[in-house]
Amino acid sequence: MTIALELQQLKKTYPGGVQALRGIDLQVEAGDFYALLGPNGAGKSTTIGIISSLVNKTSGRVSVFGYDLEKDVVNAKRQLGLVPQEFNFNPFETVQQIVVNQAGYYGVERKEAYIRSEKYLKQLDLWGKRNERARMLSGGMKRRLMIARALMHEPKLLILDEPTAGVDIELRRSMWGFLKDLNDKGTTIILTTHYLEEAEMLCRNIGIIQHGELVENTSMKALLAKLKSETFILDLAPKSPLPKLDGYQYRLVDTATLEVEVLREQGINSVFTQLSEQGIQVLSMRNKANRLEELFVSLVNEKQGDRA
């Protein structure tokens, strides 16, 4: 098993005694798509800042594909690509200049840099904008430019800090497709996001930071299994009779939409049986968004209660 990122007792105390990180231990395997979640002020940004050498740790150890970030910083940083939350490129350079110059910082030859720039700008639908100054791009295009720039030295580990913040739904889903494909081809990805649907759609494993501590580190599948219940939305055939369900919490959203809470031990089959017996046809069914968000809130509240 190859470890892409390892944090050992990572701590950060800011002036004034504010403890941002309280000893985080974490291993992310090579090839993983890992979500790092937590409320504002939990320590996510500090963790990302330390990994990317933008914030000095107080103590602990960080290694990237076995390279110690303190003792072998050059090799460690060659393995790592960062897409920060804030735009930090020269707005007066062209799109292609920005990504080609970034490759040069890592020793990529000029000819190869131009080859890579075409590859990534095309994949991210920016090739047609390659000669435009970055300041002329829309917010979504700037986000994609940040991803292209981070990939120019072809890192093994890509860290994305809120990569789809402010991006419309259609573009967000397009970026998800690109990131899934990148991960399928072998790039390890760590994602921080406030869009919990994004984490559920993309990530196989998840860590939750709260008050500078890693309070959860598990697979997405195992985390979702902790849900005590799920809420389903059922679309009913028009002019259906008024439904009545025994043993379930439910409500009619409108005359043709039924919302049902199903405990894990109950299952959904009895709902369909009861509705069928009443002559009610179910046209479609979906989960009420967002399952992960419900669980995230309950876990954070649970940990806050433990600290009280």
Curated annotation (Swiss-Prot):
Pfam families: ABC_tran. ATP binds at G38, P39, N40, G41, A42, G43, K44, S45. Has been used to construct a 2,4,6-trinitrotoluene (TNT) biosensor strain. Gene3D superfamilies: P-loop containing nucleotide triphosphate hydrolases (3.40.50.300). SUPFAM superfamilies: P-loop containing nucleoside triphosphate hydrolases. One of its GO terms (cellular component) is plasma membrane. GO terms for biological process: response to X-ray. Residues 5-236 form the ABC transporter domain. Coiled coil: none annotated. Keywords: ATP-binding, Nucleotide-binding, Transport. Induction: Transcription is increased specifically in response to 2,4,6-trinitrotoluene (TNT) and its indicator compounds 1,3-DNB, 2,4-DNT, and 2,6-DNT. GO terms for molecular function: ATP binding; ATP hydrolysis activity. CDD domains: ABC_DR_subfamily_A. It comes from the Bacteria. Belongs to the ABC transporter superfamily. This is Uncharacterized ABC transporter ATP-binding protein YadG. The gene is yadG.
